[in-house]
Amino acid sequence: MDFYNSSITEHADPDRRWELWKSKYDFAAVPPIPAGQKMAREQLDAAWAKYPEAMSQIRLGAAALSPSPQQRLTEVAELLGAQGPVRIRLIAFVGTFRRSAFSMGVKDGVSTIAIPLEDSAQDHALDMTHEFTHAVQMQQGGWTGQSVASAVFAEGLATRVTERLNPGFPANIYTTSSSAWLERCNASLPQVLDELREHGANSGAQAVSKFTYGTGTAGIDREVYCGGWFVVGRMLSDGVSFSTLGRMTQAEAEGKVAATIDSLLSSSTPATKSGSR
């Protein structure tokens, strides 16, 4: 609110608005890499015109989140067979007006999840499910760090849990994409899977961000989500339960991803439905 009010009071131009955002807010759904600041500036400029009509909801703070975060976390934990408490630090923030929820990983046994206030109740339900899946899965599996292969598993599982607990939407809603993107993903899947398999062992923020935000050699952006949707979909259709997936260690998940990619590449009709149990 301080950032917004100051920008309005000063009639700030885009450059001054960015300075105020940096000094008073500086919180965005961008990767921790040098290009992240450029992305944050572009997001702010694109979203600014939408702020006024959303201010009444933003002023509610965490009370604007619906369904109940506790209720949704419980549902995710039960589906994934959580065996023990799951500790969450929930941050309600002003995002980009385009479903920009994200997870900040686990520290001292607590997962930090950020959910945009300005989104609709439907988007809150979808995104809390997705991000809470990350929290439950990483805590139950004892994950630390991330590789490209483990990111494929994590994002694939989150999209499929979101599908299970929020049924009835087109598949692209679960992958947070356009229908055209999902069609391109499906058409280019062999190339995407080849690339993810080749780079699966790569780790670190820079390596993972390339496949999470960037565009790969197959010409598809967000290859981790593209591959993850189909890879975990195949695991589920092969009879692996959500609870088994939810408790996998990072090493187990990475191995399962590699084996499933091989299975998908040898099949002429990759699984597009979860077949979940």
Task: Write out the residue ranges for each language-model feature.
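Short pre-active-site segment immediately N-terminal to the catalytic Zn-binding motif
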Residues: 113-128
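Post-HExxH zinc-binding segment in Zn-dependent metallohydrolases
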Residues: 1-10, 148-193, 260-268
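N-terminal mature-domain "stem" immediately C-terminal to a signal peptide or N-terminal signal-anchor/transmembrane
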Residues: 1-41
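Inter-helical turn/loop segments and adjacent helix faces that build the functional surface
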Residues: 139-149, 168-174, 238, 242-244
